[in-house]
Amino acid sequence: MSKIYLEFAATSVVLALLSFGLPGSTLAAQEHIRQGAPQAPAAQALDDATIVAIFDNANTVDIETGKLAAKRGSSNEVRQFGALLARDHDMVRQQGRDLAKKLGVTPTPPAGDQSAQEQAAVIRRLSGLLGAEFDRAFLQREVQFHKDVIAAIETTLLPAIKDEELRALVVKVAPAFQAHLAMAENLLTRVASR
């Protein structure tokens, strides 16, 4: 896997999660990633409607890539992991949508959000890979994605959430992101040794 692709994948995940009206341009975000520094936008720039949009997007992103892996994975383990991701994130996304409806919160990504285009590029890139190369790229992406989501939850989203029910939901599902990260790292180690 090329270093350029890994930077691209990491950039698109961070942008998909953190570009929702937060300070900093795409170029600034890419530079932070290249230097290894996590993007840490100011928590006060977020409101609950934007956090709901970020939460929904993070789950949608992994539903899409999980479904792709369930179809294209070259090993049964990767296909099963992809199906698990799609199923888990679909359930959590629905919980978020149900809560947003209950609270009367409309997810509001800002104008100019490029996360859909970034995710489409990730899907195109992964779709062009086959066999063990697909498995490695998918798992590397999942490791980075879950690290980025966990960091965003801990340092950006939780400190900014105003509604206690929304906070409780994010806290409740955070361990699942940790579990997915551990599974992806474990699978990546096994796939890389083949």
Label each PLM-derived region with a short phrase.
Residues 2-8, 21-194:
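His/Met- and acidic-residue-enriched segments that coordinate or traffic transition-metal cofactors
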Residues 10-15:
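Hydrophobic helical h-region of N-terminal Sec-dependent signal peptides
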